[in-house]
């Protein structure tokens, strides 16, 4: 169940970013142009993740507590609207044809010799195995005390428990404040990464 929740939490910003990129792309460029699908899928998560954290900032500023519905439902609706815009602008048939063509080219590159194709497929299989092992490592192992712990996860833990973005400060300001501010080794770091961690916690429910 955790794996399904985590997968859904990761896919929402990814699909949102892909829909946004396709909706905004130049209609003069064919959807099946070489490399088009690759860069859209590759950049889709970065765009969607940034949009996700922007929305979380808006919710926090508006005093709305972080939650699966408050964050996920509007973004899912936005992704559906952007997908509809992309469908209307570029034509559904053209997009489906481009997506299927990209999948075929990924598995069996056109104009490649038999030996090159086999080598490419072996490389893909190795990458799939590598990412599967990395996913298991992320799921099974605790958070290591590196940057993820001392500078990112501290904020994520507080923001998740409080349901909003809370201020952090260095030790001197923390001692002087007495309350209302939290301590962190790097309070000036951008909040994007901790907010992504908060969203992951919300997707998992813990």
Task: For each feature predicted by the language model, list its residue ranges.
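Alpha-helical transmembrane segments at the extracellular/periplasmic loop-to-helix junctions
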Residues: 4-18, 120-126, 130, 187-194
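Membrane-embedded, hydrophobic transmembrane alpha-helices
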Residues: 1-111
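Active-site lumenal/periplasmic loops and adjacent helix-entry segments of GT-C-fold
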Residues: 131-206
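Short hydrophobic/aromatic-rich motifs at helix boundaries and adjacent loops
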Residues: 24-30, 124-129, 166-170
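Structural signature of transmembrane alpha-helix termini at the membrane-water interface
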Residues: 23-24, 55-62, 83-87, 129-140, ...
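Internal/C-terminal transmembrane anchor helices
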Residues: 107-134
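Short alpha-helical segments used as structural interaction elements across diverse proteins
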Residues: 8, 54, 114, 127, ...
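Low-complexity, intrinsically disordered, cysteine-poor segments enriched in small/polar
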Residues: 95-109, 121, 138, 155, ...
